[in-house]
Amino acid sequence: MLFMAGPAASWSLRPLGLHGVPQALCAVLLTVLVMKTLVLGDTKLEDLHPQSLPLNKYLNCYRCLLETEELGCLLGSDTCLTPLGSSCVTLHIKNSSGFNVMVSDCYSKEQMVHCSYTRASPVFGFWIFYQCCFLDFCNNPDNRKNSMH
């Protein structure tokens, strides 16, 4: 039997509406796959050093790789820059039992085809809903309810 000490000992997946270990593992796998795609997807060399870019030509977005409404950002809270004409995005990963996690990031013009789009995820029983917006920090938790519909 495995025992955990510290804060991890009191963590439980029950409040998130998960009803079994397989479902929890699928949810974690799906979240990791989405985060990998967002982080490593279409990274270009000039995107790696945004400090040297003129800010008036770029949209500032909120970035969080794992977030829940109840707990806020759990992994990777940051900002990102994307050229004007692109968008900020929040992906909602949901299932029918009420599980809902979010991933927020910048989207390039080429990725904007997914805006306001719902699709099935690679993990059975989950789906992904994309929401895009076009103002500075419109996808952060405080602005999301007003700027994303």
UniProtKB/Swiss-Prot annotation:
One GO cellular component from the entry? extracellular region
Molecular functions per Gene Ontology: identical protein binding
According to the record, glycans are attached at: 95
Glycoprotein among the record's keywords? yes
Asked if the record carries the keyword Nucleotide-binding, the reply is no
Q: Show the InterPro entries listed in the entry.
A: LY6_UPA_recep-like (IPR016054), LY6G5C (IPR026110)
Instruction: State the compartments where it is located.
Output: Secreted
Q: How is it modified after translation?
A: N-glycosylated.
Q: List the disulfide bonds.
A: 61-88, 64-73, 80-106, 115-132, 133-138
Which residues, if any, are the signal sequence? 1-41
Q: In which tissues is it expressed?
A: Detected in adult brain.
**Stretches assigned to the UPAR/Ly6 domain:** 59-149
This protein's UniProt keywords: Disulfide bond, Glycoprotein, Secreted, Signal
Q: How does it assemble?
A: Forms oligomers.
Its biological purpose = May have a role in hematopoietic cell differentiation.
Q: What is this protein called?
A: Lymphocyte antigen 6 complex locus protein G5c
| Species of origin | Mus musculus (Mouse)
